[in-house]
Amino acid sequence: MRNISRKDFLKIGAALPLAMHSLSLRAEQGKKRPPKRIIFINSCLGFYKPYFYPKKRGDLSTSDYLKGMKTKEKMTVFQNLFHPGMETSNHDSEKSFLTGTPSPESPTFVNGMSLDQVLARQMGGDTRFPFLNFSIYDRGWGISWNDRGSAIPPMHDEQKIFQMLFEKEDLKAKKQQLQNDQNILDCLRRDLAQLRKQGANAGKLESYQAVIAELETQLNHEKFWLNTSKPKVPKSLSDDQEFVFSTKIRNLFELAKLAFRTDSTRVITLSMDWISGAIKVPGATGAWHTLSHHANKPNIIAQLSKIEIDTLKHFNRFLFEMDQIKDGEGTLLDHTTVVMGSNFGDASNHTCDFLPMIVAGGGYKHQTHTVLEKQTPLCNLYLELLHKHNIDVGSFGSSQKDMGLLNS
């Protein structure tokens, strides 16, 4: 386990069955203060640094990109974060955005467990969906990785996500699916027993047993929620076909907001992965990846900035609307930690230092803009987020210490 110690991993793993037992206490917990929630958003080609960071330290009104944010008092921009061991990782660095595992470009690379999954083990037991993973398009992986270092495929079809979250299921078909899953699980248990008889090595047995335990937990979780009605919400997705890329981002943010608002989940990832070919946003048409290699040419930067401004427009709207939803004595944003950033500090040169990172909401006393020491490990921030969500671990990835900057 590269990104978290074995001792800490076992401690976290123990929380998963405990979380399942806590389901019966859900109604009682609902009477207490609102639960904590968290979302991680990765824009895989980063943001043009001169426009992203404030020109005057601590003053977001001097950032070309962020000056229009409506919730500036509830966000902090962190400057000078990086992931060690990514000097030659290029686009592969996206795989390590939430793990901090070095050298993802290596043919022998094995990823660690991503931060969202560590949190989901602690936070996911009381909701229908322990976690949700979204992406712009379907390539089979995003920024979420399980404890075996395997990618957890994200969902990208907005209509199917809405259907999964809020539309009534065919109960008979669902029961049959769960029975089929149970049959598969029984077969796997028999296979495991046979492997034990054959004297398979301990490592193989442990891995096999871990898979079975994970599937069993998932199956029991689905059975628990089988007869519980899904929340009903009006369908508020955009069908604008002129700006498909922009519409997709807007809709995924909308789905994240609805999922949090209905307490369907408490952990979400959103991977803004780049699409080959031209995309169209208000004011610009071009290939996002090609434009990101701007070579400091003003005309190309002007086009690139339109794409990045459009992305941040939807981010701004998401934060503002979350902050308008009453949740306990505060707002939904106050009880949701929003982490937005990138695996690239400069996509034009494929560098992975000076990573742009925003933390918003969460009820923290935000500092608007914090300039850290150069080459501060991003995993220091991740470690602090784990601690803020009551997960007592000593380290995560390349972390050196808890930053101690997100005070409540």
Task: Describe each region flagged by the PLM.
Residues 1-408:
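Ligand-binding pockets and gating/stacking loops
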